[in-house]
Design a protein with these regions (language model features):
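N-terminal leader/linker segments that precede catalytic domains of diphosphate-processing enzymes
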Residues: 1-154, 162-178, 183-222, 237, ...
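NUDIX/MutT-family hydrolases
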Residues: 223-253
Length: 282
């Protein structure tokens, strides 16, 4: 059986994994005075040399004309993705759907950008995760496809994914729940948990996401619909925490369970990095 002390030990270790430094050789991506992300300098040069939408000095920035309206900002992001795709640098060029981009967790949407540009430019996007509980208190997890570029073959949350442009987090978690687990809104009971920001270095660039976590009590068996899950399995919460500690689970999925376990023990995590709805940031 786990304790709050052990759970917070897991929290500290996972938090360290989820907050990686910007690597050397990256430059800031800016829109006006806002820092939107980070990109490899040679990639920034490749884009800025092929379009007037972007300028490269000590950082990469939108031109004054491209920065004027949200529509023009989005067009510049799309053009940048097209250039990187043309050069064969994007890992998933087919993911052209738009996502919302923010300068920080507290800022409104600055612009929209293609999903396939988010990692390349290290853009701050929004994602959702759900820890699924069975009536006996065990946790349902999903194993990612071994061929996934990030976390292939690792255990993951029952459902997780990026929030699309103009989509609410609740709409996104229900969509992901149906796509990844085949469950509908009348088969689960959702509870909103905490929110944190993850920053990870990946081969393509950086993953920078505002992660909203939910719990769900489910009444039906999951069935994957999008082909992105190898298998589903149930574990006790302490087993899941040990999977996360052992590197056998996506770090963000482990963090979601840590937040959930603490909340179910009647304790919020007292750390500004983990934020709860209605909580004031000082």
């Amino acid at each position: 059986m786990f304790s709050s002390t052990f759970t917070m030990t897991v929290y500290d270790e996972l938090k360290a994994h989820l907050n990686e430094e910007v690597p050397a050789g990256f430059v800031q991506v800016r829109g006006g005075k806002e820092i939107l992300g980070y990109v490899k300098k040679d990639w920034a040069m490749a884009v800025a040399s092929r379009t007037s939408d972007w300028r490269l000095t000590e950082h990469m920035s939108l031109s004054e004309e491209a920065e004027v309206t949200p529509t023009k900002r989005a067009a510049a992001m799309i053009h940048a993705a097209e250039i990187l795709d043309m050069l064969g640098l994007l890992q998933n060029p087919q993911h052209t759907e738009l996502v919302d981009v923010r300068a920080s967790v507290l800022d409104p949407v600055y612009c929209q950008a293609p999903r396939n540009l988010a990692r390349a430019f290290g853009l701050l996007t929004t994602s959702v995760r759900m820890t699924g509980y069975l009536p006996d208190g065990t946790v349902m997890c999903a194993k990612r496809l071994a061929t996934k570029s990030i976390g292939g073959g690792l255990w993951d949350s029952l459902a997780a994914g990026l929030v699309k442009a103009s989509e609410t987090t609740e709409q996104a978690i229900y969509r992901e729940l149906f796509e990844e687990a085949g469950l509908t809104s009348n088969e689960v009971t959702l509870t909103e948990g905490g929110r944190f920001v993850q920053q990870l270095v990946v081969p393509e660039g950086m993953v920078r996401e505002i992660v909203y976590h939910y719990d769900a009590s489910k009444s039906a068996n999951p069935a994957n619909r999008d082909g992105q899950v190898m298998e589903f399995a149930t574990f006790t919460p302490d087993k899941v925490l040990n999977l996360a500690l052992g590197g056998e689970m996506m770090y963000a999925a482990g963090m979601g369970l840590v937040e959930s376990v603490m909340r179910r023990m009647g304790q919020r995590i007292e750390d500004k990095w983990m934020h709860y709805r209605g909580q004031f940031l000082i």
